[in-house]
Amino acid sequence: MLRQIADGVLIHESGFCQSNTVVVQGTAGVLLIDPGVHGSEMACLAHDLSDSGQTVVAGFSTHPHWDHLLWHAGLGEAPRYGTARCAATARDRLSGGVDAVAKAAGIPEQVPLDLLGLITGLPAETARIPWDGPEVRILEHQAHAPGHAALLIEERGLLVAGDMLSDVLIPMLDMNGTADPVEDYLAALRLLEDVAGDVEILVPGHGSIGGADQVRQRIDQDRAYVHALRDAHIPADRRLGPTAMPGWDWVGGVHARQLQLLAQRTERDGTPG
């Protein structure tokens, strides 16, 4: 079910990892950001949009992880965009076939994969999504995944953060696609911090919507976690351990794996990250 969170902006929340699809209303139709996740959920989204007389005129994937590269036939054949690096990474990862990706990533059977990753890369350094609607700024960085983009809709006071600034997920660093995953993540947080004063509503890729009072709080929380990870300290983070939200205890395993990978990189290269 669609829920309005700002003037001309709605979200659709999936039961899979509390994933958020963002719908932005434009002049002739809507921009769809990270639609997902199960087939029945995307069919419901398509039905809700159709019932309200809305046509999808553009799509955008914030980064090249499978749950952000989805689409459903009921959403139509609008152009689907991502940053140039995001699109190139998606093509490369899908070059061995969708079935191989599904097996490696453990994608649930309820997820339709026939339209997975069919996105067009925007020219490098494109500043805004090309569509007839509110101006959507692209804030590209290299935290979490190659070509990751946050989206800022200034006239709505809205920041779509992709897989950052979540109240349920810790920062997950890209340990394989970058020379310095720690600094890349910290640089991305600084980028988001630079626009925080313009944000009244924060939409993470997974988790709860945040208000203006939570934007800097979540930035600080993510930064503190990354610092603790870098220094191999135990993070005082409510997303881990007994304070984690019910059903999210598996995030502790993600943290343990990141500690291990970062320690291996430090041993190999001599520097954290």
Annotated model-derived regions:
Residues 12-13, 119-120, 140-142:
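Short Gly/Pro-enriched turn/cap motifs at secondary-structure boundaries
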Residues 43, 47-128, 224-228:
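Active-site HxH/HxHxD metal-binding segment of metal-dependent hydrolases
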Residues 3-9, 107-112, 131-136:
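Short Pro/Gly-enriched beta-strand edge/turn motifs at strand-loop
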Residues 28, 53-56, 77, 155, ...:
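A general structural motif
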Residues 1-47, 51, 150-162:
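Conserved beta-strand hairpin/beta-sheet module of binuclear metal-dependent hydrolase folds
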Residues 193-201, 208-273:
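Accessory terminal helices/loops
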Residues 30-31, 37-38, 135-142, 146-218:
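Metallo-beta-lactamase
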